[in-house]
Design a protein with these regions (language model features):
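Small-residue-rich helix-interface/hinge motifs
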Residues: 2-27, 42-99, 128
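Membrane-interfacial alpha-helical segments at the cytosolic side of multi-pass membrane proteins
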Residues: 26-32, 70, 112-120
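Short, hydrophobic transmembrane alpha-helix segments
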Residues: 30-42
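Short, charged/polar low-complexity linear motifs in solvent-exposed/disordered segments
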Residues: 33-35, 83, 94, 106
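Membrane helix-loop-helix hairpins that form the core translocation module of multi-pass transporters
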Residues: 100-125
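Conserved small/polar residues in nucleotide/adenosyl-binding loops
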Residues: 126-132
Length: 134
């Protein structure tokens, strides 16, 4: 695609950012400026957005790895302001294989949610409790 910038290549798959991804960066800068966030809050917000896009990229790699299992090449993965797209060379002809490729991305999301949920369940939140009247 003409409006993309190559970021890196992972497992032989080019990862690209669409020009519209710049809108996300502008949005982050706007929110930080608009709300006069502290440095800590600004860093936290930027990290939240980055983690979200890492999850999007992992989701797309889920589709790509499932397609690779059926010898279907992934041309590239493109991230934009609204999400990601794994561009596959072809679509599996057998419905069962197509379902596996289609469900691989959401399966990655479930795995991420499970890992994060287990971690959050294991940590203490006593420092986040509201003060109570004595």
């Amino acid at each position: 695609m003409v409006r993309t910038f190559h970021l890196c290549t992972i497992t032989g798959i080019p990862l690209k950012a669409h020009l519209s991804f710049g809108l996300t960066l502008l949005f982050v800068a706007y929110v930080v400026h608009l709300h006069n966030l502290t440095v800590a809050a600004s860093v936290g917000f930027v990290l939240l957005v980055l983690v979200m896009f890492v999850c999007v990229i992992l989701h797309e790699f889920g589709h790509s790895m499932a397609a690779r299992r059926y010898s279907i090449e992934t041309l590239d993965i493109i991230i934009s302001h609204i999400g990601g797209l794994a561009r596959l060379q072809d679509v599996p002809e057998e419905p069962q294989k197509e379902i596996v490729v289609a469900l691989a991305g959401p399966t990655v999301n479930v795995a991420i949610a499970t890992i994060v949920g287990c971690y959050l369940h294991s940590v203490s939140y006593t420092h986040l409790t509201l003060p109570t009247k004595a």
